[in-house]
Every structure is written in C-alpha cells, then in structure tokens.
C-alpha cells in the first residue's frame, strides 16, 4: 500500500494568469493498493465512488500503468482524508491527479521523470499552473509549448504567509472561463506583463514593499469579480488591516490575502468582518509548501 500527501495549490496569483501557481501547506492524503477484484474508491465521509472510471485519481493511476505497459486488475483507493475544499480554486482536481501519478509510480517501484509526470498530469488537467506546484512544491512559473511543459521555481526569499478565505459557494471553472473576453487591449496586456514580471523579481529578491502593486490584474479578475459576492469590500478590508496584496485563488471562489508574517490580529479582524457577511466565509493562515507531493 502507498500513501501520498498532496498540497493545495493556488493558481494565477493575480497578474500571472495561467502561468503562476504556488503550493500551500494544506493537504489531502490518498492511499492506493492493487487488488485482485473490482476497483473500490472511498471518498470523504466513507462514501464509495460508484462512477470510479471517471475519478481523476483512478484515471491518473491507469495512465501511469499504461506508460509502463503494466497490467492491472483493480485498485483499492482511499481518498477520505481530504482537507482541500472542493471546487473552491485551491487545486482539488490537481491534487487528485498528482496523487494518482505519484502513488502509481511508487506502487510500481518505478522512477518516472518529473517531465513525464507533468506530461501525464497536464494531459488530464489541460494546463500546468496547478499540477506543477502540486507535484513540485513552492511557487512555480509554467508554460505549455506544444507537447512540452516548461517550468521554473521562484526562490521566494521572504517567509510570506497567506490568509485563505473560503466561502460556502462554488465557482465552476467553466463559468469562470466563460465570463472572460476573447480580446484584450494592448494596455491591459502590458499592465499584466509588467506586473507579472516584477512580481517574480520581487518574490525572488524579498522586495515585499513592492508587492502592494503586483497582484493587480486586468486579464481575469475584473471579469470574475461578479461571480464572488462582496469581493471588493473584502479586499478593501484586507488592505485596511495590512495585507501586502489580495487576489482570487485560481478561478475562485477562494480569496487570498498576502501577509509579511504570521498575523493573528489580521486573521481575527478579517474573521469578524467575514462573519458579518453571508455565504459562510471561513479564514485560516497557511504558508508555502516547498516539497510538493510526497510518499509518507
């Protein structure tokens, strides 16, 4: 039996639309073992997945077995230890995919390269901005060029913390893509290119004083804001209470405020404000995970 721990991830980070992603110290665990009988997948709460052939972890495992031309009969997969909120922009799908790939590779006692793991993950997920940090940890820049996945790790100099704010409503990735325009002005494109470029530099050099200007975006967040209740007032409060910057995590509905250091006072103030709103917001503080998916 193999047990894998996979971190949550947050894609985009404001100006880095479909390019930047980071791993967070919030984890799911998946256990995998081969069986002689029918595949059985246990979900959160102990419920069995009756439609397991569409399960992302199962699909990922099969892709690895096919990669190595290995035969199989069935699997016993336990996905019940889940801490990453589903469909909230924190990489729950990426965790399922990466957990399946890393787990199957270990189960077969093989040594698949990072390149091949990423290729399988992106083939399933469609883009690398969540699966890359879920696999590798840290803050990752990634691009897809034809069949190649090219990535680089940002060596974040400061020990930043992140106030993660999660409501009780979901935003589907499909809907969040649908609200985006087909064309952008040159000014908006330059706005994002300049901020994304400087964000990478500021993170790498520990220039926290610049971060206030670098999570702003004109490519996706202005259009997705209407899908998230009270986002403007939440961002204003976070700024008032000392955040270095705020952004939508992935396609939402989770929001993230960046903190220079652990700040219990910020969390308490924001919790008080969030409690005054509807939608059951909860808030917690995390930091970057730098290990990615690991066998435990």
UniProtKB/Swiss-Prot annotation:
InterPro entries: GHMP_kinase_C_dom, GHMP_kinase_C_sf, GHMP_kinase_N_dom, GHMP_knse_ATP-bd_CS, Homoserine_kinase, Ribosomal_Su5_D2-typ_SF, Ribsml_uS5_D2-typ_fold_subgr
Transmembrane region(s): none
Chain residues that bind ATP: 85-95
GO CC terms in record: cytoplasm
Protein's pathway: Amino-acid biosynthesis; L-threonine biosynthesis; L-threonine from L-aspartate: step 4/5
Enzyme category, top tier: transferase
EC number: 2.7.1.39
Pfam families per UniProt: GHMP_kinases_C (PF08544), GHMP_kinases_N (PF00288)
Entry keyword set: Amino-acid biosynthesis, ATP-binding, Cytoplasm, Kinase, Nucleotide-binding, Threonine biosynthesis, Transferase
Gene Ontology MF terms in the entry: ATP binding; homoserine kinase activity
Main location: cytoplasm
Enzymatic reactions: L-homoserine + ATP = O-phospho-L-homoserine + ADP + H(+)
Coiled coil start-end: none
Compartment list: Cytoplasm
Domain of life of the native organism: Bacteria
Function field: Catalyzes the ATP-dependent phosphorylation of L-homoserine to L-homoserine phosphate.
Protein name: Homoserine kinase
Annotated source species: Clostridium acetobutylicum (strain ATCC 824 / DSM 792 / JCM 1419 / IAM 19013 / LMG 5710 / NBRC 13948 / NRRL B-527 / VKM B-1787 / 2291 / W)
């Amino acid at each position: 039996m193999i047990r894998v721990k996979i971190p949550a991830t947050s894609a985009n980070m404001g100006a880095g639309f479909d390019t930047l992603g980071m791993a967070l110290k919030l984890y799911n665990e998946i256990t995998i073992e081969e069986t002689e009988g029918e595949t059985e997948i246990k979900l959160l709460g102990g419920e069995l997945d009756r439609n397991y052939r569409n399960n992302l972890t199962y699909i990922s495992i099969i892709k690895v077995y096919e990669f190595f031309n290995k035969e199989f009969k069935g699997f016993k997969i336990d996905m019940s230890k889940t801490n990453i909120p589903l469909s909230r922009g924190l990489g729950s799908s990426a965790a399922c995919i990466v957990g399946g790939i890393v787990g199957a590779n270990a189960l077969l006692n093989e040594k698949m390269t990072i390149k091949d793991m990423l290729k399988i993950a992106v083939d399933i997920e469609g883009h690398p901005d969540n699966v890359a940090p879920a696999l590798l940890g840290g803050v990752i820049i990634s691009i897809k060029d034809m069949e190649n996945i090219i990535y680089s790790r940002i060596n974040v100099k400061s020990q930043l913390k992140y106030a993660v704010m999660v409501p009780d409503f979901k935003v589907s990735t499909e809907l969040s893509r649908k609200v985006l325009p087909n064309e952008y002005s040159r000014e908006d494109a330059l706005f994002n290119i300049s901020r994304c470029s400087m964000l990478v530099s500021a993170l790498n050099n520990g220039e926290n004083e610049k971060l206030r200007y670098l999570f702003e975006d004109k490519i996706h967040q202005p259009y997705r804001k209407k899908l998230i209740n009270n986002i403007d007032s939440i961002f204003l409060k976070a700024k008032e209470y000392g955040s270095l910057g705020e952004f939508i995590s992935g396609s939402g509905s989770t929001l993230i405020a960046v903190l220079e250091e652990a700040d219990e006072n910020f969390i308490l103030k924001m919790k008080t404000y969030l409690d005054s709103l509807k939608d059951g917001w909860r808030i917690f503080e995390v930091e970057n995970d730098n290990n990615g998916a690991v066998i435990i």
